[in-house]
């Protein structure tokens, strides 16, 4: 974990035991979207610490990931979006305008 100390973070901020949730591939067709939400909303999801979203292709229009602070992530094949899964990061998947969007998602967990 030396790279963390190089940027001013220390091992004690990371959970002592951790793991990843199963990966899911999601398909969004024209008009499909995901309304504004947070990724930790109940007991079952309470162990989520970081969200990972991988854009698997970008030959479609629309489908951006938008955070409520106005930050917009435009899909690009191979890009990995990582952000805290907490209530402080509500976000939405905007509607796909043409083509088909594929993403892979997983979460870093406290165990």
Regions found by a protein language model. Give the residues of each.
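Fe(II)/2-oxoglutarate oxygenase catalytic core
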Residues: 1-80, 88-111
